[in-house]
């Protein structure tokens, strides 16, 4: 429930007040995903996260490649680390940091926002976590069972939700 060394891409840090946010990792074991296709997994994770957030309000978008925004403010970051065997991904560690109930941000991050700031009410973190994990698993299973159809659908959904795509 407390993250002490949150990180993002290129060594950036992630600030999280103890007991207020979601900072978690989950491990996936792809069976036939090539390293060159790793972005398809990233699309699935980002979409599942946005989809879960849209149960609370709208206005969320995906800032390529791995940030979730509400309007012009960052609410979440996603980091995926893959292990390879030959040209295939054998393990993916998916880390997500999501601002839920934190009201004050002290870091130098330029534009953080949390669900409590957006909605004005405390959010049940366990319920939100369950929604995100269910979405991740549904997207992941779809990728594993019908890769071509899943990629086609995810690409359309992802593009529709891109931040500043105009």
Feature roles, as predicted:
Residues 21, 66, 99-101:
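Asparagine-centered polar/low-complexity signal
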Residues 2-3, 98:
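Active-site metal-binding loops of divalent metal-dependent hydrolases
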Residues 9-32, 41-42:
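DPxDG-like acidic metal-binding loop motif
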Residues 31-59, 70-166:
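Long, positively charged amphipathic alpha-helical accessory segments at protein N-termini or as interdomain linkers
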Residues 64, 69-70:
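Glycine- and Gly-Pro-enriched alpha-helical subdomains that act as flexible
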Residues 6:
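Phosphate/pyrophosphate-binding loops and the adjoining catalytic core of nucleotide-dependent enzymes
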């Amino acid at each position: 429930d407390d993250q002490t060394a949150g990180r993002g891409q290129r060594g950036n840090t992630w600030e999280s007040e103890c007991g207020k946010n979601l900072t978690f990792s989950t491990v996936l074991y792809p069976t036939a995903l090539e390293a060159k296709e790793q972005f398809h997994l990233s699309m699935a994770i980002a979409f599942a996260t946005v989809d879960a957030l849209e149960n609370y309000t709208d206005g969320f978008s995906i800032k390529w490649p791995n940030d979730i925004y509400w309007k012009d403010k960052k609410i979440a970051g996603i980091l995926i680390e893959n292990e390879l065997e030959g040209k295939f991904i054998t393990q993916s560690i998916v880390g997500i940091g999501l601002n839920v109930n934190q009201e004050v941000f002290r870091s130098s991050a330029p534009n953080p926002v949390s669900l409590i700031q957006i909605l004005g009410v405390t959010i049940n973190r366990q319920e939100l976590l369950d929604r995100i994990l269910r979405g991740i698993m549904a997207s992941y299973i779809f990728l594993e069972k019908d890769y071509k159809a899943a990629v086609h659908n995810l690409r359309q959904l992802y593009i529709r939700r891109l931040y500043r795509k105009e």
